[in-house]
Structures are given as structure tokens and as C-alpha cells.
């Protein structure tokens, strides 16, 4: 058997590596390498972390939650930059915290810009405080609504806003700012329109189902009037992109149509009186509103239905009648507005429930 003897060069190489291998001491994997803890950092470091903790503990229900959070984060990043520069001498920590500080300052500036007081024009202040502010519409959103595609127009006394069977209802939607307008149909006076009320809300609702219609009434300025006028098409596109404002308009227009129905029953009723009488409308008012709705909806022609209601109202108004509060029986239940059918208003009593 042949044996190969190691060369002297290989032996010297192995012997040379032995001292280096002996100097290496492996670290067990189940023990920590932090045997000696370093000293506690400077107070500035702890103050920065306290600011971060306070910012994260701010409740989200607080109105200025995001602003306070960004303020505390900005203060904390500033203290970190000071600590890394003066006490740690760490360039990388200073750079990263400077970047975080810049981001927080930019976001804080944006939040403060959004919270700035928005100035509303004097002519539009009454409309905002009366209609939109109670529904929590922000001033900046109202300014967007009234600043892009609407104009303020004027009408002198006697000038016509819309003529029945001639003026298209597809062009505009308006709110009266100042003055008073008179609405009539075939020469019959219907009701007045007062400030902070929509001029053509029924027509706006009808055009959502049918296009190309004409005004069924004539609207004339009974005084020098100023009104806010939107382009119907552009307003529709804007409301489609703002679901919140879309629901606000649906509510306001529905309420305005209801007030106009009350005014049909009493032409001298203004907006303030309607607001006071809404919780306690008399029985005759509710009956006349149901008659008007049924007359219009049951007729194939809207003009014939409204004309039939006007003739019935004028004939009944000429008869001497006592106060409805005096004639109404205390056992009679009030009629709900949601009932649209006359057959559902008065329900016959079953013989089983009649007294012997």
C-alpha cells in the first residue's frame, strides 16, 4: 500500500492558521450579545418619544385630532434632529428625522389651510345660514357650489321669470335672495315666493323624469328681486360627483315643494308662518293638500287636474264655513300626509266593532 507523505509547505500552512482559529470564540445562539448595556440617552431623546406617545393617544373623536397629531409628531421629529446632531453625532438619524419633519410640516400646513375661515358673499350669507348651515354643509363646499357655475341675476317689478307653456324648465334652478315673486296659473293666483326659497323646485323635480317640458305656471316679480341661478345641466353633473350635496338638495327641494303645497291652501302664508304651523297643521289644510295631490295625479293632464282643484277651492271658499278647529270632532284622527289615496283616508268601521 502506497502512502503519500504531506509536503512541508502544507504542514507550515496548517500550523500558521492554528493560532487564528484558537482566537475565535463562537457565540452561543441562545444567549444575548448585549452583555454590557450602554448608558441612558440624553433627556432630549426621551422628550421626543413622549411627544410621539402623546400624539398617538389623542382620541379620534376630537375635532382637531389630525392637527394635534401632526403638531406632536413635528415636535418629536424636531427633538430627534437636535438629539442626533448635538448628542449622538449621527448623520443618518439626523437626515431621516429631517425628512419626517418636513412631511409632517407639509401635512400640518394643508390641514390648517382647510380650517381657514371661508368668507361667504353678503348676498349668499342668508341662504347659507338659513338652508345649508343647519344641515352641516361646510362653508368651503358651499362656496364651491355657488362659485363655479351660478350667477346672481335681478328682475324688476313686473318682469317675468317664467311664462306658462313657453319657458323651458330644463335650463336653470334658482333660489330667491331678495324680494317677492307671484305664481299664477291661467290667471289664477296660486302663491307667493319669498327669500331663501326655490323658485322652480317642482319643475326641477319633474325634469328628473321627463325632459323638454314647459312651465305650467307663470312666475312674475312682485318686487325688485335678486336670485341665485344655477345652470341645470352643470349643477346635475356637480351633484353626481358630490353625493353629500346631492342628498342635501333632495331634502331641500322636497321641503320647498311641501311649503308650496301649504301656500296653495293659504296664499297669504309666508315661509315663517309655514315653519310655525308645520307641527300643528289643521285638518282642513291636510284634506285640501290631499285633494290637490289626488286631483293632479289622478288626471291624465296636469293642467286639467290643477284647474279642477282650483275651481273646487274657489267654490268651497265662497261658502260660509266655520273654523275647522271648531267643527272637527275630538274623536277624529288626523290624516297622515303619506296617504295618497282618498279611499285610505276614511276607513269604514266594521260592524263587529260597532256598539249595540
Curated annotation (Swiss-Prot):
Start and end residues of each stretch annotated as Required for interaction with CAV3: 93-115
Positions in the Cytoplasmic compartment: 70, 114-356
Keywords, in A-Z order: cAMP, cAMP-binding, Cell adhesion, Cell junction, Cell membrane, Developmental protein, Glycoprotein, Membrane, Nucleotide-binding, Phosphoprotein, Tight junction, Transmembrane, Transmembrane helix
Keyword Phosphoprotein set for record: yes
Cellular-component GO terms for this entry: bicellular tight junction; caveola; cell projection membrane; lateral plasma membrane; membrane; plasma membrane; sarcolemma
Region (Disordered): 313-356
Assembly with partners or alone: Homodimer. Homodimerization requires the C-terminus cytoplasmic region. Interacts (via the C-terminus cytoplasmic tail) with TJP1. Interacts (via the C-terminus cytoplasmic tail) with ARHGEF25/GEFT (via the DH domain). Interacts (via the C-terminus cytoplasmic tail) with VAMP3. Interacts with KCNK2; the interaction enhances KCNK2 surface expression and is inhibited by cAMP. Interacts with CAV3.
Family: Belongs to the popeye family.
Protein name: Popeye domain-containing protein 1
Source species of the chain: Rattus norvegicus
